[in-house]
Each structure stands twice: as structure tokens, then as C-alpha cells.
């Protein structure tokens, strides 16, 4: 017997939402509020850890930035953020007291996104610096609201302790 289930027959799906199943190759990494769940593919997390640790052995430890790509889906009033890729912001001056998403940086990010993650949208950003506090500073919040508002997230990572945190404004 074959059972056919239509979108209209599912009482859990609200208007404007589409039904979906959670993928198996992805794990929940964070929650940014009761109605906002964050999932990230393992290879993306591994890439971000390696990116964060590239400066550990340098005398001058600058910050590392990447833009997160993926998609946001809604189910029963809850947002599910799926992070499926990350684009490193190369040649960007990044420190906890100075971040500059210049026109040139955005151009490079969009080119890489189109090349590697064409079917995905920007869903947030990543910032890492050794000995960074796991709290969003006023500068990080300003940068987030200017470039990544709405449903997008900020992921902070401290590479030496392997701590991370998510923020949404």
C-alpha cells in the first residue's frame, strides 16, 4: 500500500511553510532562542575550526572571518537554520575592536559563494580570535545588524579552548 500525504493534510504545517525532514548528515549545533534551531554539516565545522586555528602559532594573532551559507526553513512556527558551507573572508582586517567588510571583501565573498555554493544563501557569519570572550561586543553587534540582519546568525569561536557560541539579533 502506498500512502500519499499532501501538504494541506498535515496539521503541523502552517501557512507559508513547507514540510521537510531533518537530514541525517547534519547535527544540531546550537539554539538561538526557543523557536530557532541551528544545524551545521560536519565538514563546515571542521573547516571553521581549522580556519580559526591558522593564527595560533603566529606572534600577531588576528581574527578570522567567514560568511556562512545554507538555508532557513520553517516548520510548526520554528526556524531551522541549515549551515551547509562557509566562505572565508580573505584579506580582511579583523580584530575584536575593528572589522571592515569592504566592497572588495564582499566582492570576493560573492564570487566564492557563486563558485562553490551557488544554490545557497548567506545565513550568517563567523568570527574567531584567540582569547576572545564568548560574548558579542557592541562592535560585533553593529557589524551583524549592518550586514547580516534578520534571521541570520553570528558564530563566535575561541580556537584555543574550542569554545563556540551563536547569536541572533
Model regions and ranges:
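N-terminal beta-strand/alpha-helix entry module and adjacent surface
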Residues: 1-124, 130-169
Amino acid at each position: 500500500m502506498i500512502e500519499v500525504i499532501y501538504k494541506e493534510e498535515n496539521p503541523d504545517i502552517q501557512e507559508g511553510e513547507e514540510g521537510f525532514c531533518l537530514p541525517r548528515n547534519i547535527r544540531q549545533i546550537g539554539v538561538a532562542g526557543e523557536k530557532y534551531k541551528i544545524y551545521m554539516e560536519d565538514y563546515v565545522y571542521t573547516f571553521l575550526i581549522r580556519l580559526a586555528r591558522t593564527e595560533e602559532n603566529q606572534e600577531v594573532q588576528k581574527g578570522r572571518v567567514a560568511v556562512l551559507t545554507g538555508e532557513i526553513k520553517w516548520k510548526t512556527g520554528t526556524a531551522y537554520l541549515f549551515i551547509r558551507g562557509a566562505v572565508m573572508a580573505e584579506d580582511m582586517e579583523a580584530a575584536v575592536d575593528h572589522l571592515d567588510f569592504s566592497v572588495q571583501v564582499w566582492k570576493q565573498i560573492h564570487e566564492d559563494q557563486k563558485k562553490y555554493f551557488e544554490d545557497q544563501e548567506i545565513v550568517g557569519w563567523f568570527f574567531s580570535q584567540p582569547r576572545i570572550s564568548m560574548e558579542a561586543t557592541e562592535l560585533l553587534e553593529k557589524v551583524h545588524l549592518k550586514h547580516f540582519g534578520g534571521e541570520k546568525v553570528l558564530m563566535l569561536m575561541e580556537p584555543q579552548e574550542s569554545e563556540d557560541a551563536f547569536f541572533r539579533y
